[in-house]
Amino acid sequence: FPLRRSAIRTDAFRICYPRRKMVNTPRELFGRTIYVANHPASFMDPLVIAALRRPIVFFMTRADVFTPISKPFLWACQMLPIYRQHDGGDTKSKNNEVFKRASNVLKGGRSLLIFGEGFTDDVFIRRLKPVKKGAAKIGFEALESINWSKKIYMAGVGSNYSRPNQM
């Protein structure tokens, strides 16, 4: 969705966040990458990562925001629903379908962003929470579906904000 990408990359982003710092970035931009990120701030984390990555990134988003009204818009923004155990219901069978879609995204040379911690705290805490195993499962499923013929990369992304209460 070129319009969304260009809207995020506007000068407003650079004005609001004049001091950005990327550490240990790869020299080349790879497709087929699973970005596993922490999630300290609810709304800003995906925007920052999308603005800094050139290949189109598909986002794993919690499934409860996929209402009948919002679903078409979220699909257009390359968001895939992820069903969490602590939300209740039959998450395993629903996630198997989503993991297949995510695997197809990776097979198509696109990248995927998943927040591995699984949730955001109401209070900003400067430490990582335990990472869930879904990103590794998606990566292995994608590799198995292409018979291990292409590389799929996994990159950790850490977000930290100097003044999180002023966002």
What residues fall within each predicted segment?
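Soluble catalytic domains of membrane acyltransferases
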Residues: L3-S6, D11-M167
